Amino acid sequence: MLNPVQLLVDLIRQPSVTPELAGAFDLLEAALTPLGFTCTRVRFEGDGGSYPVDNLFATRGTGGKHLLFAGHTDVVPPGDAAQWSHPPFAAEIADGLIFGRGAADMKSGIAAFVAALAEVGDLAGTVSLAITNDEEAESINGTEKLLAWAEAQGHRFDFAIVGEPSATTRVGDSIKLGRRGSLNGRIVVTGAQGHVAYPERANNPLPAAATLLLALSGKLDDGSEHFPPSNLEFTTFDVGNLTTNVIPASADLRFNVRYNDGWTPESLVEAIKGVIAEQDLHEAAAEFTVVGRPSRSFLSPVEGGVETLIETIARRTGVPPELSTGGGTSDARFIADYCPVVECGLPGRTMHKADEHIRLADLEELTALYAAFLKDYLG
């Protein structure tokens, strides 16, 4: 039997800060190959100068329902090691807890799923794992390209689980069946520079910029059945002017929108343009651009694998899970283009923090939950 605790210890001890792989895939291949999985490493690079990324695709079985498990082995930097009471890559165990960068996000989910596969043995249908080493940073040469590659190899998926932290206080109390979309924007408001003593010879862009900030900030709608209201938050207001006697020539505004399933990136862009056009900017010019590539919102229907997972959790815990769409973006947004997807993992209270840790009992419970679902869905 494969011990999820030992596998997690071994994974944490690989300092796989994006995009450094360390030995994470070696460990996974060593665990999966004896279970009958064919493991393939795929490296992607390019696209705007992004760094090369190693990815792992492992698959076993043919025909029947095809279950995909997705996750990432990369972790965020640990920061100042002096802020940790346990070294970030030592995987020390104390008082029923295991400490280390990636313990919660999300090497524990991977360790639990691989251990669950070892526990249940042979299954009907097909099981695949798509593991990237670039989820925490640019996410350009990771899951999105790996899934396109897998589809080109003939793989079609019926349901996917992402092992990201999804629970709030106990394993199974919450799963994420959707995510809000995210769009980053920039507005440059241009006026005319001048001396503050002669405002009639200048055109101060700050009042116009403030008008736009107030017009666009806050809720964009009232929410939907499964999503909270869409929200636009300004994050930067910069004029590049440290003096008090110069009216600046321009103001640079940056913002992010987290939006629900009532919007697409295209409709959101048009709405923002419409609000800008309605404002009196006192002859200042406003140029709006989208920064980077927006991620779309998605929602998986409560049927098929989603319904089976809910039933499995309810049977084990006595309570159906909360169906959440909260939180930030994840690689589930890429998987949603191929099949229904749910995030189901541990509580994530300490992810990205110093002294990141999980309870060993939670790791054991997640392993048991995954094993029960594998039997229910593919048994």
Regions found by a protein language model. Give the residues of each.
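Active-site metal-coordination/substrate-binding segment of hydrolases
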Residues: 66-128, 362-365
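A structural signal for isolated positions on well-ordered beta-strands in alpha/beta enzyme cores
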Residues: 40, 68, 128-130, 287
